[in-house]
Regions:
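Active/binding-pocket-proximal capping segment
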Residues: 155-168, 174-186
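Extracellular hydrolytic enzyme modules, especially secreted metalloproteases
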Residues: 1-155, 161-168
């Protein structure tokens, strides 16, 4: 519904009715269905907001920071950080759909030529590069701003992000995901608009001497 005058709800939210509340007030029904978990959204909320809350209800963690002193880990490259509508990271779609949206993310283990389709494609849409730490690795995916859900992205190119499998969502100060971007550091925001690698923008090397560089 639209924003009303109820003082208890100031923004979209997910929640669950507690057993204590139900025992005191009885079951809450809507259209003959008992309500347990719920999502409150306003009719003027953006499509991105609707998608973010729906995906969270399906198990996807929010990726935005709750404390402003830490850099945003993902930004516009995943709808769970926002603010615009875009595809979730391929790793997110693999992990939080139980392998039903994305079956697997193969690892690059040797020098070779690899085909990487854009992130909206069902196959060959990501690769991972392992590190010495079994809980950390890098993921490569190709983002195409000609895709209907990604038209707001600044450009097309290769996106590289780090995954910490022992973290969950926007855990502070080290999050589960971190998208590498120009001038980015663990404590420096950098420029998320300049995250992609391509021959067109001149970022075509990812090494200890490049900007950004692969810190873990």
């Amino acid at each position: 519904g639209s924003r009303g005058t109820d003082k208890g709800v100031h923004s979209p939210q997910n929640g669950e009715l507690s057993e204590r509340f139900i025992n005191a007030n009885g079951d809450i029904e809507l259209g003959g269905k008992k309500i347990k978990k719920y999502t409150i959204l306003y009719e003027r909320s953006s499509l991105a907001t609707h998608c973010r809350f729906l995906l969270n209800e399906l198990g996807f963690p929010y990726l935005y920071r709750f404390r402003s002193e830490y850099p945003r880990p993902v930004g516009m490259w995943d709808v769970m950080d926002g603010p615009e509508l875009t595809l979730p990271l391929v790793y997110n779609r693999w992990k939080y759909s139980g392998g039903t949206w994305v079956e697997d993310i193969p690892a690059i283990r040797s020098h070779a030529t690899y085909t990487l389709n854009s992130a909206d494609k069902p196959e060959k849409n990501a690769y991972k590069i392992l590190t010495d730490d079994p809980t950390e690795f890098f993921v490569l995916e190709y983002r195409n701003n000609q895709n209907a859900y990604e038209r707001h992205l600044p450009e097309s190119g290769l996106l590289i992000y780090r995954v910490h499998t022992d973290k969950n969502g926007s855990t502070e100060p080290v999050p589960e995901f971190y998208v590498f971007r120009k001038d980015g550091e663990i404590d420096q925001a950098g420029d998320l608009n300049e995250a992609l690698f391509s021959d067109i923008n001149g970022r075509n090397i990812f090494s200890a001497a490049s900007n950004p560089y692969p810190f873990i």
